[in-house]
Amino acid sequence: MAGFGLPNFGQLTEAFRKAQQIQQDAQALQEELDGMEIEGKNSDGRASVWLSGNQQPLRVRLDPALVQDGAEACETATLEALQAAYEQSTATMKGRMEELTGGLNLNLPGMGG
């Protein structure tokens, strides 16, 4: 089979083993990210938004003084806090995904790798 540019059976077996390990690790990572609570705050700290590691909204907290400033101030502060939480959450997810896949050599001869 090697004459057709295909990997040998041992390489395929190893690739499948790695794929199964990645799948198991990805499931564990999904559960870990779901359990995280990542807080983002606006610049003056009067609005906070919490997201999971998978960017699912969890809760919002607005300082009572911010609420007294009116709807527009609340909207602006909440959006700023949401953006901060989203940036932190996506950075966390990206970092954990890189940890998950970083040490794996998935290139196989004859398979475009």
From Swiss-Prot:
GO cellular component assignments: bacterial nucleoid; cytosol
SUPFAM superfamilies (alphabetical): YbaB-like
InterPro entries: YbaB-like_sf, YbaB/EbfC
Superkingdom per UniProt: Bacteria
Pfam families, per the entry: YbaB_DNA_bd
UniProt keyword annotations, A-Z: Cytoplasm, DNA-binding
GO MF term list: DNA binding
Signal peptide: none
Compartments where found: Cytoplasm, Nucleoid
Matches recorded under NCBIfam families: DNA_YbaB_EbfC
Family: Belongs to the YbaB/EbfC family.
Known function: Binds to DNA and alters its conformation. May be involved in regulation of gene expression, nucleoid organization and DNA protection.
Subunit: Homodimer.
Name listed for the protein in its UniProt record: Nucleoid-associated protein Syncc9902_0023
